[in-house]
């Protein structure tokens, strides 16, 4: 007689949840990389690093930091809205390039 270990049983729902988690991880990593790469144009280490300059006493850095905070918020709002639409079956899963093309663009202050 074979015993069934219920902890090892994977349902279709379990597989779907796991696939969605992997998809979210993949797409959110791509969005994060996209933002980090953009700010390296001006020698910032990452979007997080640039955002810390929003409270700088140097006007140039403060403007760039605040612009980055606003852009980051817009990007994540749009990115998570797209993921919610995918989860809800309202749209197909975008490729990374498709996702990135739908995100707001960053414009450096004074550019």
Please report, for each region that a protein language model flagged, where it lies by residue.
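A preference for well-ordered globular domain cores
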Residues: 1-111
